[in-house]
């Protein structure tokens, strides 16, 4: 019973705190630009509004258009549950869980790109092609980072890998993971998720035809992914040890 409660608590932490990080980022960006900016809790308001709205479907859309965001959200949530939360450890930990984490992130990306192509829109197909092109580089970088941590710690378990020091290569590891964080979360300089400029859109263009709950799943999944990479970056560079239980 305690394990179930612990799992539910960790799940609630990830799901409830994830939309807060994009709000903080947008607030800081607005402050730097000299603007007031949206409220920190704006994404919570948007998600609540989208869950109450209906879904507008293209006549060319298949069931994969609806299933894609749902499967991607489940995959990202599962990946988050594998990620240790500081010294408290992770909800699901086993030997080789880091490999499952990489596969779940790839599955989420595949489902998002698949759903984009199911609309029959050349515009979203272009975005899916751009996403896959960047994924080739990002996945190679994250695999290299995982391999370096595995060699350094002698383990392929996330809890062990992130509870020990990264050694002399911590700076290079941090630079690599930070680059992956930017590429995976619409934060590269020419991919602004707040704009709709055709020449620069990568991630945002894939979800232009989504609405209602599927769009809410996409936005919430993106916030979970951003928080996951932020936690991974911090713990890879600043290991916090491990406690037996919460």
Regions found by a protein language model. Name each.
Residues 1-246:
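Alpha-helical transmembrane segments of multi-pass membrane proteins predominantly involved
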């Amino acid at each position: 019973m305690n394990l179930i409660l612990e799992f539910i608590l960790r799940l609630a932490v990830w799901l409830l705190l994830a939309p807060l990080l994009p709000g903080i980022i947008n607030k800081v960006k607005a402050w730097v630009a000299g603007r007031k900016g949206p409220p920190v809790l704006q994404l919570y308001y948007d998600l609540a509004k989208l869950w109450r709205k209906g879904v507008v479907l293209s006549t060319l859309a298949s069931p994969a258009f609806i299933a894609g965001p749902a499967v991607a959200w489940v995959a990202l949530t599962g990946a988050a549950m594998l990620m240790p939360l500081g010294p408290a450890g992770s909800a699901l930990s086993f030997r080789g869980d880091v490999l499952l984490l990489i596969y779940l992130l790839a599955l989420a990306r595949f489902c998002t790109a698949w759903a984009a192509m199911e609309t029959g829109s050349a515009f979203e197909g272009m975005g899916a092609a751009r996403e896959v092109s960047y994924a080739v580089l990002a996945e190679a970088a994250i695999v290299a980072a995982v391999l370096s941590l595995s060699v350094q710690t002698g383990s392929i378990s996330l809890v062990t890998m992130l509870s020990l020091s990264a050694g002399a290569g911590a700076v290079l590891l941090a630079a690599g993971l930070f680059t992956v964080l930017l590429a995976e979360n619409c934060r590269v300089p020419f991919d602004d998720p707040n704009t709709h400029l055709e020449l620069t859109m990568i991630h945002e263009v894939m979800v232009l035809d989504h609405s209602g709950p599927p769009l809410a799943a996409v936005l919430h999944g993106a916030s979970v992914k951003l928080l996951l990479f932020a936690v991974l970056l911090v713990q890879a560079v600043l290991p916090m040890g491990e406690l037996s239980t919460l």
